[in-house]
Amino acid sequence: MANHKSAEKRARQTIKRTERNRFYRTRLKNITKAVRVAVEAKDLNAANEALKVANKSIHSFVSRGFLKKQTAARRVSRLAQLVNTLKAA
């Protein structure tokens, strides 16, 4: 239990940030999984659509400060690589 007003505020902020980060983390996992599932099913159209959604979402996470720019670039690059394996096959 916080004894100071500022500590109470920090506790509230921590709860808010934790919930927000959990939401972003879950969303990131789900959009990544959608791309991987489409690739495993060998569905090029679905994989491209999922990649487009993933790209947009991941870069929006950067603008919100959830991910660093390079981390987002790496994740998008790896997903694009996965989708390109379908095009090559």
Curated annotation (Swiss-Prot):
<feature type="region of interest" description="Disordered">
    <location>
        <begin position="1"/>
        <end position="20"/>
    </location>
</feature>
<keyword id="KW-0694">RNA-binding</keyword>
<dbReference type="Pfam" id="PF01649">
    <property type="entry name" value="Ribosomal_S20p"/>
</dbReference>
<dbReference type="GO" id="GO:0006412">
    <property type="term" value="P:translation"/>
</dbReference>
<comment type="similarity">
    <text>Belongs to the bacterial ribosomal protein bS20 family.</text>
</comment>
<keyword id="KW-0687">Ribonucleoprotein</keyword>
<dbReference type="GO" id="GO:0015935">
    <property type="term" value="C:small ribosomal subunit"/>
</dbReference>
<protein>
    <recommendedName>
        <fullName>Small ribosomal subunit protein bS20</fullName>
    </recommendedName>
</protein>
<keyword id="KW-0689">Ribosomal protein</keyword>
<dbReference type="GO" id="GO:0005829">
    <property type="term" value="C:cytosol"/>
</dbReference>
<keyword id="KW-0699">rRNA-binding</keyword>
<dbReference type="GO" id="GO:0003735">
    <property type="term" value="F:structural constituent of ribosome"/>
</dbReference>
<comment type="function">
    <text>Binds directly to 16S ribosomal RNA.</text>
</comment>
<dbReference type="InterPro" id="IPR002583">
    <property type="entry name" value="Ribosomal_bS20"/>
</dbReference>
<dbReference type="InterPro" id="IPR036510">
    <property type="entry name" value="Ribosomal_bS20_sf"/>
</dbReference>
<dbReference type="GO" id="GO:0070181">
    <property type="term" value="F:small ribosomal subunit rRNA binding"/>
</dbReference>
